[in-house]
Swiss-Prot record:
Annotated S-S bridges: none
Main location: cytoplasm
Protein name per its UniProtKB record: Recombination-associated protein RdgC
Family: Belongs to the RdgC family.
UniProtKB keywords: Cytoplasm, DNA recombination
Gene Ontology biological process terms in this record: DNA recombination; regulation of DNA recombination
Protein task: May be involved in recombination.
GO cellular component: bacterial nucleoid; cytoplasm
Biological classification of the source: Bacteria, Pseudomonadati, Pseudomonadota, Gammaproteobacteria, Pseudomonadales
Domain of life: Bacteria
Any one GO molecular function term: double-stranded DNA binding
Places the protein is found: Cytoplasm, Nucleoid
Length: 306
């Protein structure tokens, strides 16, 4: 269980939460299949294991792992449009009259309801870790929309969830640009070989560099011309590598082999033990990594009144 992406949310109040109360709350919003006329469903499912008795909360030390599943029927717009056009053409030809918007919308709704039971179903899961001792919720996603879907459903289950996206005092683009300009990152962070540069003008250009020497004259000329670094690949403390963007999304997380080997050793032969060991080691690593990252980016911004 290693997160591949990371969106960080700050709890703005102490969250009085234990495994039993969280398990009970999530049980009120379980994942379930789409009914024949439903476009989508969303709810919580067991992060590890299957079956009705699998717990919805996995606990390790004082960290909680949860998982939400979205199920949606895929009904391509082109299929609906073609069916609607065929129906409208048929009515206009047979009844010698024009079909106007109100009737067209009604026909579209009828077509959707007819096609829905035969539509393909797509399922996707999103994991999140709740760390009350750190005051953080960590979502394994690079999509803010997916993270907000999980958090809003968690808020409904708990009744309230005082949380906001984490922010820092200095604009991330300014810090990332400075690191590439000076060819040195702060603390135990190291600049790797990938970045995205954007012009500050609205219609300005974008340069994406992969497997390139970011200390090269070519890159420095782009920075001198006014481009800002909006994504940068970094390594931290010989433990993990990642890409950080200007929205503080951590993408393409990769934990170094030493950590993964340690998790395999700690987990033993049992599959659940392996998952638990990797989750625990990941969270203990995040407990060191995230404060170091916030500090390197100029410190966490705490909005007034929070």
């Amino acid at each position: 269980m290693w997160f591949r992406n990371l969106l960080v949310y700050r709890l703005t109040q102490d969250l009085q939460l234990d495994a039993d109360s969280l398990e009970k709350a999530l049980g009120e919003k379980p994942a379930r299949p789409c009914a024949s006329q439903e476009l989508t469903t969303y709810g919580f499912t067991a992060p590890f294991g299957k079956g009705p008795d699998a717990p919805l909360v996995h606990v390790s030390q004082d960290f909680f792992l949860i998982s939400a599943r979205k199920e949606e029927r895929i009904l391509p717009g082109s299929v609906v449009r073609d069916a609607l056009k065929e129906k409208v053409d048929e009515i206009e030809a047979q009844q010698m009259r024009k079909v106007y918007k109100k009737e067209r919308d009604q026909l579209k709704d009828e077509i959707v309801q007819t096609l829905l039971p035969r539509a393909f179903i797509r399922r996707s899961s999103t994991f999140a870790a709740i760390a009350p001792s750190l005051g953080l919720i960590l979502v394994d996603s690079a999509s803010a929309k997916k993270a907000e879907d999980l958090l809003s459903t968690l808020r409904e289950a708990l009744g309230s969830l005082p949380v906001r996206p984490l922010s820092v005092k200095v604009a991330p683009t300014a810090t990332l640009t400075d690191w590439v300009k000076t060819q040195e990152a702060a603390g135990d962070f190291h600049v790797l070989d990938e970045c995205e540069l954007r012009d500050t003008h609205e219609d300005g250009g974008v340069v994406r560099c992969k497997r390139q020497d970011l200390t090269s004259e070519e890159i420095q000329l782009h920075l001198t011309a006014g481009k800002l670094v909006t994504q940068l690949s970094l390594a931290w403390s010989d433990k993990l590598s990642f890409v950080l963007d200007d929205k503080l999304a951590v993408k393409r997380l990769r934990f170094e082999d030493l950590l993964q080997e340690q998790a395999e050793k700690d987990g033993g032969e049992d599959a659940l033990g392996q998952l638990d060991a990797s989750f625990t080691l990941m969270m203990l690593t995040f407990a060191e990594f995230l404060p170091a990252l916030f500090e390197a980016l100029g410190g966490e911004e705490i909005p007034q009144g929070v």
